[in-house]
Amino acid sequence: MSAHIIDGKAAAARVLQQVRHDVNILKAEGIEPALAVILVGNDAASEVYVRNKILRAGEAGIRSLEHRLPADSSQARLLALIAELNADNTVNGILLQLPLPAHIDENRVLQAIDPDKDVDGFHSENVGGLSQGRNVLTPCTPSGCLHLLEETCGDLSGKHAVVIGRSNIVGKPMAALLLQAHCSVTVVHSRSTDARALCQLADIVVAAVGRPRLIDASWLKRGAVVIDVGINRIEDHGRSRLVGDVDFASATEVASAITPVPGGVGPMTIAFLMKNTVTAARQQAHAQRSQPEAVCLSTY
């Protein structure tokens, strides 16, 4: 058996095509979606991620504003910038590129972002809303994974999904989205004593642990659909290359479909960042239109 390779680049292109269409509709209504990107320091990987996000925003017709702060910037300075962007009605989405320098409290600054502009979906209001099934901005990577699963499998109702990893960025929101899609969901993690056995029962496996090639064919049920979120850089015969959390070569002999690394989940993350930005712009415009006009009372 040779697995179908899920093309994340092609799927992301389709999402971005719809985003461009939605942006054009908003612009016709006088609304120009805008995304503010904040980068603290000069981490090489973060520089690449920010550059790619700004490039995709431009391609989608979304205005981008890049804010760079030195690595030694104080937390107060970062919070002041976030407050300024929160108050700016021309900014619809705020993205804070992670990781942050060690002296900055990541949770504190993420919670300072207006939930309506939190296009990463990390604010506690959006996290809580997701767990309750409300219509909120959801984390981009899990949203992209769910989209790939629905394109590949169709209706996910009744399928047994195992999420490997319990991070706030991927594992937990992924489990919540799969529950909303009516899957039976199991989350395994570093303290699970029977992770491999549980995965062997799964129709869907989402791997997000950050350990290169941890999941091989022995973890998988024949015919399972595998979404590999991991991005790990390894040395292979003297050369550096990217691999996922799944041993791709062995998994393709058992799985019915699998995402590659690179070219699988990564492009979907950026595509759904753009989708979230357009959603935020639309919702903010609707909220502004719904506000009652001020009534001026003259005194005689």
From Swiss-Prot:
GO-annotated cellular components: cytosol
GO biological-process terms attached to the record: L-histidine biosynthetic process; methionine biosynthetic process; purine nucleotide biosynthetic process; tetrahydrofolate interconversion
Keyword terms: Amino-acid biosynthesis, Histidine biosynthesis, Hydrolase, Methionine biosynthesis, Multifunctional enzyme, NADP, One-carbon metabolism, Oxidoreductase, Purine biosynthesis
Keyword field contains Amino-acid biosynthesis: yes
Residue sites binding NADP(+) per the record: G165, R166, S167, S190, I231
Enzyme Commission number, as recorded: 1.5.1.5, 3.5.4.9
GO molecular function, one term: methylenetetrahydrofolate dehydrogenase (NADP+) activity
Covalent S-S links between cysteines: none
Pfam assignment, any one: THF_DHG_CYH_C
Keyword Amino-acid biosynthesis belongs to the record: yes
Annotated metabolic or biological route of this protein: One-carbon metabolism; tetrahydrofolate interconversion
Record's catalysed reaction(s): (6R)-5,10-methylene-5,6,7,8-tetrahydrofolate + NADP(+) = (6R)-5,10-methenyltetrahydrofolate + NADPH; (6R)-5,10-methenyltetrahydrofolate + H2O = (6R)-10-formyltetrahydrofolate + H(+)
Job of this protein: Catalyzes the oxidation of 5,10-methylenetetrahydrofolate to 5,10-methenyltetrahydrofolate and then the hydrolysis of 5,10-methenyltetrahydrofolate to 10-formyltetrahydrofolate.
Quaternary organization: Homodimer.
Family, per entry: Belongs to the tetrahydrofolate dehydrogenase/cyclohydrolase family.
Identification of the protein by name: Bifunctional protein FolD 2
Organism of provenance: Pseudomonas syringae pv. syringae (strain B728a)
